[in-house]
Amino acid sequence: MAELAAGGDQRAALLAAATLFPPPPDGARFSYGTAGFRAEGAAMGPAVCRAGVVAALRSAKLGGAAVGVVITASHNPVRDNGVKIVDADGGMLSQDWEPFADALANAPNPDALLQIVLQFAKDEDIKLGGSHSAQVLLARDTRPTGEYLLDVAVKGVNAVIGAVAVDMGILTTPQLHWMVRSKNKGLKSSETDYFSQVIDSFRCLLELVPKDKEADVINNRLIVDGANGIGGLKLEEIKAKISGLDIHVRNSGKGEGILNESCGADFVQKEKVVPLGFGPEDVGFRCASFDGDADRLVYFRIVSSSDTRIDLVDGDKILSLFVLFIREQLDIINGKDNKGNEVLPTRFGVIQTAYANGASTDFLKNIGLEVVFTPTGVKYLHKEALKYDIGIYFEANGHGTVLFSDHFVSQLESLTSEFSSKAAGSSQHQAAMRLLATSQLINQAVGDALSGMLLVEAVLQYKGWSFQNWCDLYTDLPSRQLKVKVQDRNSIVTTDAERRVCQPNGLQELIDGEISNYSHGRCFVRPSGTEDVVRVYAEASSEEAADCLAKRVAQHVERILG
């Protein structure tokens, strides 16, 4: 093979790694999605090794730019584990490479794996055998299988001659994304640098809170559910350095309970009940919840010590809070200049999926914002957000972020400098500094529960808002989700960001007919990305109506698709 600069050695290295971790003969097929590869931790060895190979080849393809591998299964039970590849921009693996990752993970034997790698390297013009440098940063969460699987990933990386594996330690998933992005931009990229940037930018935002907004309604006590995972541990490490907040961590990962078991953002958002680890002393206080690898964030308040129900603030309402804050700063800056032009013209994009609660979308539209919809999945939301000067997206589950384009940040820095020399301390100067600090605080690579939580706290203090003020932005419409088992989920074809059905013929008309029977009715169906079911989502003005609408539409799906 001409594409192998050190043919025999490279072949031998790949064959040896594949032989060490053969897939079980009856193993399930892997499919690389938003979550990467996931399964029971004990069965993940082969997929993790092969993901290491993919990451090393991706780095080689990109001229040696750092690529990341994180060992985590996020909000899944502790017995599970997984592997995700972080692309050089700090985002998710390029979708163009997902079929190759699938093919490699499912290669039945070492020879098949070798041939897949050789063909792909030839197609992508990747010179193997050490002529291209490659570097892969690796991290893991706190799962018991994590240490072993990280070692397996290192062996996969090392199977590509010339690739260097760097163990960054036990980290949150967003920390590794941040590190990869920062390293490739030539910025400081250690964990210490991450913490310094987050803490300093949060402190800056607190210093810019207007004196008249420093109201008594803001209690600085914040109770955080760490899901018994890495996010709780990291918060415990730095909470003493975070000014302006009295942080108490429950489910910190120091042995109080089991990872993600009856706690964490996924549990809180779906079950809408008090997580384990909270008691009567927490009633009425502002609470935040991370998921297992700290890339999701939701807030809640315990209503009563005699009731497990909570007041939930999900990703939709976090998005709404951030939108109000950012737009207010832009409005302050854009006091018209002498020519009637905007001082800082800004393309501000708000991105949601069909699963966003209709009340949140109505709220955003009613304050004059255009909402753009994408298909379900962070990779679609993130890609759309990148098109704007400021692009913000959140899923209801609490995963999301605010993206600032490099060009916009550069403009903002110049404007801040100009204000500093001509109008230091003016409202415009302070608003520009707030936006700059926000761009430093919120993770520019991926959703990050820790930095997102600090931005929430800074905005609440800026606005002088209590938790109740935040809750009162709007009232969520009741919703219901159902799954319908079908013979072939792919016989459903959707359009308009999965909000309408174009195949099979006639189904959308039936859905529209059902929706018309309910006040504030909304319903859509879409094929599941992971199992042979069709997912039904319905909203209406009451829980009973939402239930009825979902069931009626599910019956139509079942009748037509069997």
Curated annotation (Swiss-Prot):
GO molecular function: magnesium ion binding; phosphoacetylglucosamine mutase activity
Cofactor requirements of the protein: Mg(2+)
Disulfide bonds: none
Binding of Mg(2+), residues: S74, D291, D293, D295
Pathway it works in: Nucleotide-sugar biosynthesis; UDP-N-acetyl-alpha-D-glucosamine biosynthesis; N-acetyl-alpha-D-glucosamine 1-phosphate from alpha-D-glucosamine 6-phosphate (route I): step 2/2
Principal EC category: isomerase
Keywords: Isomerase, Magnesium, Metal-binding, Phosphoprotein
CDD domains in the cross-refs: PGM3
Binding locations of substrate: E395, A396, N397, R526, P527, S528, G529, T530, R535
Gene3D superfamilies registered for this protein in UniProt: Alpha-D-Glucose-1,6-Bisphosphate, subunit A, domain 3, Alpha-D-phosphohexomutase, C-terminal domain
Catalytic activity, reaction form: N-acetyl-alpha-D-glucosamine 1-phosphate = N-acetyl-D-glucosamine 6-phosphate
The enzyme's E.C. designation: 5.4.2.3
Swiss-Prot/TrEMBL GO biological process terms: carbohydrate metabolic process; UDP-N-acetylglucosamine biosynthetic process
Protein family membership: Belongs to the phosphohexose mutase family.
PANTHER family according to UniProt: PHOSPHOACETYLGLUCOSAMINE MUTASE
Protein function: Interconverts GlcNAc-6-P and GlcNAc-1-P.
Record-given protein name: Phosphoacetylglucosamine mutase
Species the sequence originates in: Oryza sativa subsp. japonica (Rice)
